[in-house]
Regions:
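Start-of-domain marker
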Residues: 26-91, 98, 108
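Short coil/linker segments at helix-helix boundaries
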Residues: 72-141, 156, 179-197, 222-258
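Alpha-solenoid helical repeat scaffolds
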Residues: 44, 51, 91, 98, ...
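Terminal, low-structured helical/coil segments at or just beyond the last alpha-helical repeat
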Residues: 233-253, 257, 261-311
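Flexible helix-coil transition and linker loops at the boundaries of alpha-helical arrays
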Residues: 53-64, 99-117, 151-169, 184-185, ...
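Bacterial Sec-dependent N-terminal signal peptides
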Residues: 1-39
Length: 311
């Protein structure tokens, strides 16, 4: 689901730096002991020493002391509470790291403080994506609050961050959630409309996103298919003609239009080429169907799409 962030390599580098500075820190025995215990994964003992350090007049003015305190909480969160959106250790880690940024000597430790904040930001982002798949009804407040926390910390850790791709991933994840709910009960048009709204919001953010156009096309195409499925032997002839006209009109005026936009942006993407061919087939556009079948064969021969997928 979505595009999860994984910064384990970066965090590993930060840990080495953390240990080195802990050994080098002068006049801060409590902080150094906390760092050493954290390195040994003795987190309860490390936290006790770190708590003593931030309440020590001699050590609490130093950014490194607050960094170590935040780092210990971060490690406990990572090892014991990862995925817990209400984690007090994550919140405490954040508060201590932000406190470290306000100390007079924060500049000396700024890089490693920001790396720790960047890691915490990534967990908020991943939680936002996960929560978007299990929201109750149409209440998006939880994933959007988590995303806001991600943005807030990233603006501190990496001020030049471009959030466009992250915003699109959240909208996509919400769209997938609503689409899945609609597929479970196609009579509930609310889910279809919400899915459409989310993918349309991606287009508003980035008019070059081929996946968003593709998903909008799929929604309307499936809607037309579900309309066709209502036809049966007992359907009145006039009603059948009306329903067929509405379904084909939906494919022609909405689904195909968005699929053509997707194709213009990504003409060699397998699902898009196959999707546009299927829509032309539904509309009895024989020449277009023949053209796209040839395109699919070319893309298969060039190794750009898999041959085991249906043409």
């Amino acid at each position: 689901m979505g595009n999860r962030i994984n910064w384990q390599i970066t965090i590993g580098t930060m840990l080495l730096w953390f240990i080195h500075l802990g050994m080098a820190a002068q006049g801060m025995p409590l902080t150094n002991e906390a760092a050493k215990l954290c390195q040994q994964k003795s987190y309860a003992a490390a936290l006790k020493k770190a708590d003593e350090a931030i309440h020590s007049d001699a050590e609490s003015r130093d950014a490194y002391t607050w960094y170590v305190h935040g780092f210990v909480h971060k490690e406990i969160f990572k090892e014991e509470e990862l995925g817990n959106r209400q984690s007090t250790h994550r919140r405490q880690a954040e508060e201590s790291l932000l406190r470290a940024m306000k100390c007079e000597n924060a500049t000396r430790h700024e890089d490693m403080i920001k790396l720790a904040l960047k890691y915490l930001a990534s967990t908020y982002y991943n939680d936002a994506l996960q929560s978007s798949q299990v929201i109750a009804g149409e209440d998006e407040s939880v994933p959007r609050k988590l995303f806001a926390d991600f943005r807030r910390l990233m603006n501190i850790a990496v001020p030049e961050t471009n959030f466009l791709d992250y915003e699109k991933e959240l909208e996509k994840s919400l769209g997938q959630h609503y689409f899945t709910l609609w597929q479970r009960d196609t009579e509930v048009g609310k889910w279809r409309d919400l899915a459409t709204k989310r993918y349309a919001s991606i287009v508003a953010l980035d008019s070059t996103d081929s996946d968003a156009y593709y998903n909008l096309a799929v929604i309307d195409y499936n809607r037309a298919v579900f309309m066709y499925r209502k036809l049966g032997p007992d359907t009145d002839m006039f009603d059948a003609i009306t329903l067929q006209e509405e379904a084909s009109g939906l494919i022609r005026s909405k689904a195909l239009v968005n699929m053509e936009k997707a194709y213009a942006l990504a003409p060699e993407k397998g699902e898009i080429v196959r999707g546009i061919m299927m829509m032309h087939r539904a509309l009895d556009h024989e020449k277009d169907v023949a053209y796209f079948k040839t395109e699919i064969e070319r893309l298969i021969n060039e190794g750009k799409i898999k041959a085991d997928q249906p043409k």
